[in-house]
Amino acid sequence: MSALVLESRALGRKLSDFGQETSYIEGNSDQNAVSLIFSLKEEVGALARVLRLFEENDINLTHIESRPSRLRKDEYEFFTNLDQRSVPALANIIKILRHDIGATVHELSRDKKKDTVPWFPRTIQELDNFANQVLSYGAELDADHPGFKDPVYRARRKQFADIAYNYRHGQPIPRVEYTEEEKKTWGTVFRTLKSLYKTHACYEHNHIFPLLEKYCGFREDNIPQLEEVSQFLQSCTGFRLRPVAGLLSSRDFLGGLAFRVFHCTQYIRHGSKPMYTPEPDICHELLGHVPLFSDRSFAQFSQEIGLASLGAPDEYIEKLATIYWFTVEFGLCKQGDSIKAYGAGLLSSFGELQYCLSDKPKLLPLELEKTAVQEYTITEFQPLYYVAESFNDAKEKVRNFAATIPRPFSVHYDPYTQRIEVLDNTQQLKILADSISSEVEILCSALQKLK
């Protein structure tokens, strides 16, 4: 299941004073805030005129930051958060900024108004803004959870949650000393699943798994450390792990994939039921997801889903999350004359990994228009699975689906700056074209040398 949930709710936030460690506290999230990004020519009094305009129209700024424009050397870009009460005057302000002052303006919003684009992170550091907005926390377990009546387990879960809440991008993921009981639970899951991988898992999973055993400590008697696994992932595909305390909203989780960041749980399931977990745990993340995120083609496919989610309307977020469910979580693929499992929900479930390749479920070809609206169950084995021709084929289908999402721009991930570039003007398109041209020249040169 990963750190993904298909339902948006009021989310809690972690309050932090100047980066110091704190515990999780329920608070008001700024879900309805409106953000403006505008650029101004670098000249005396330019920003003062805009601030005066805001004041005259009773616009209340709650945050402002600036940086030199990466597109135009003679301009500065300003990112501002506006109080929700300023919304009625916003349309007039944007009109004045564009026509009278000559600013380039982009409006971002987390509300559901039709004329605005939902907020999304533009830099990898901005993942800090929502990584703690989980739908459950630490010791808050449902009554049917195997660890609900175990105070020691609940306290342990809170320890893992606090690690995740205090984490910030760029920091090494803290090491965890797992207990002997936790190692025993891991060992049971590891041993049982590994016995099926050669016959049931896809080639990519089986190719990477021995490398994880060699370099990341994947053993029956050892629970790997997330930091070591994250470094291995980065060396393979640029993906990295980020600790999370529980389930994120679909929009936030998919947004992380756009930056090749996988929000990953660090706790382990309750020892009384080692072959069952009602939520994603470290067994699911490391045995199911990590091997595939180490594969270049699959990593790019996963990132395509994340990029498609940025700025998408809520109804398309639900569709993308459903596509994610039937591919990254419960996907099957053709390999030669056989069908193999690549979904993490299958590769981390002994029972369903056997079931999905039996004659019991229904198998359908991956057609995203149908997959995106297919209902599914979260309490029992899936009655049907979608079969991809290949990861590259699935990736192209996601790109085609993304083209149908109603948003007034396209996006591009810059791996050098770890930023999302919004492609909505000719200058940005020219910069991207120049970059692609340079890569094509390298390719052509290499081909010439092979002749």
From Swiss-Prot:
| List of residues that carry Phosphoserine | S16
Give the reactions, separated by semicolons, that this protein catalyses.
Answer: (6R)-L-erythro-5,6,7,8-tetrahydrobiopterin + L-phenylalanine + O2 = (4aS,6R)-4a-hydroxy-L-erythro-5,6,7,8-tetrahydrobiopterin + L-tyrosine
Question: SUPFAM superfamilies from the entry?
Answer: ACT-like (SSF55021), Aromatic aminoacid monoxygenases, catalytic and oligomerization domains (SSF56534)
How does the record describe the protein's post-translational processing?
Answer: Phosphorylation at Ser-16 increases basal activity and facilitates activation by the substrate phenylalanine.
**Requisite cofactors:** Fe(2+)
One matching Pfam family, short form? Answer: Biopterin_H
Summary of activators and inhibitors of this protein: N-terminal region of PAH is thought to contain allosteric binding sites for phenylalanine and to constitute an 'inhibitory' domain that regulates the activity of a catalytic domain in the C-terminal portion of the molecule.
Keyword hit for rRNA-binding? no
Asked if the keyword Cell division belongs to this entry, the reply reads no
Show the GO MF annotations: iron ion binding; phenylalanine 4-monooxygenase activity
Q: What class of enzyme is it?
A: oxidoreductase
Q: Binding positions for Fe cation?
A: H284, H289, E329
The metabolic or biological pathway listed in the UniProt record of this protein is: Amino-acid degradation; L-phenylalanine degradation; acetoacetate and fumarate from L-phenylalanine: step 1/6
What are the EC numbers?
1.14.16.1
Q: Where is the ACT domain?
A: 35-113
Q: Which UniProt keywords apply?
A: Allosteric enzyme, Iron, Metal-binding, Monooxygenase, Oxidoreductase, Phenylalanine catabolism, Phosphoprotein
Biological process (GO) annotations? L-phenylalanine catabolic process; tyrosine biosynthetic process
* Family named by the database record: Belongs to the biopterin-dependent aromatic amino acid hydroxylase family.
Quaternary organization: Homodimer and homotetramer.
Entry-linked NCBIfam families: Phe4hydrox_tetr
Question: What does this chain do?
Answer: Catalyzes the hydroxylation of L-phenylalanine to L-tyrosine.
Query: What is the protein's name according to its record?
Result: Phenylalanine-4-hydroxylase
Per the UniProt record, the source organism is: Bos taurus (Bovine)
